[in-house]
């Protein structure tokens, strides 16, 4: 008997989004009982909404903060491979949405330590060095569905 062919599921998420976190957890649970292979990819709420002149000031300020985890996720992927994205994403999102940690310096440092990645990756949070790659990943997720949807995006 041959194993069933796996269906590829590409999930595009921003750690700051609670809806993405719930969807990611659901996808991982579904992967336990269905023939799917789920890949976690970065999208950015800041990239999606940052050029909207109608945003309230507090939302615009929050979007600046939202760049930080996606930059670190991207830096980690580029330095250590795609396989670190799921655990790092889950560590960040759990800290933000379950543990209610609001200080993203703490979220990032603790998540990197939890998954055994170098602490110096945290420097990517405040660097624009990875922004082009964040945008590229964001657009790989968003372009097929249009920019009038938010996070998460799932491609099957």
List each language-model region with its residue ranges.
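Short metal-coordination and nucleic-acid-contact micro-motifs, chiefly zinc-binding Cys/His arrays
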Residues: 5, 13
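C-terminal cap of thioredoxin/glutaredoxin-like
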Residues: 6-7, 24-32, 102-156
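A structural signal for isolated positions on well-ordered beta-strands in alpha/beta enzyme cores
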Residues: 8-10, 39
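Short, surface-exposed acidic/glycine-rich loop or hinge patches that mediate macromolecular interfaces
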Residues: 14-17, 128
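Structural alpha/beta surface segment adjacent to cysteine/selenocysteine redox centers
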Residues: 15, 21-108
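Short alpha-helical
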Residues: 18-19, 132
């Amino acid at each position: 008997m041959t194993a069933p062919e796996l269906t590829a599921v590409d999930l595009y998420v921003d750690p700051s989004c609670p809806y993405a976190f719930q969807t990611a957890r659901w996808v991982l649970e579904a992967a336990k009982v269905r023939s799917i292979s789920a890949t976690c990819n970065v999208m950015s709420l800041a990239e999606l909404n940052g050029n909207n002149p109608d945003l309230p000031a507090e939302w615009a300020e929050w979007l600046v903060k939202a760049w930080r985890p996606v930059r670190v996720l991207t830096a980690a992927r580029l330095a250590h491979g795609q396989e670190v994205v799921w655990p790092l994403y889950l560590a960040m999102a759990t800290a933000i949405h379950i543990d209610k940690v609001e200080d993203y310096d703490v979220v990032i440092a603790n998540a990197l330590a939890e998954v055994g990645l170098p602490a110096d990756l945290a420097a990517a949070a405040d660097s624009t060095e990875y922004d082009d790659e964040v945008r590229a990943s964001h657009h790989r997720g968003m372009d097929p569905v249009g920019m009038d949807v938010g996070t998460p995006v799932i491609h099957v």
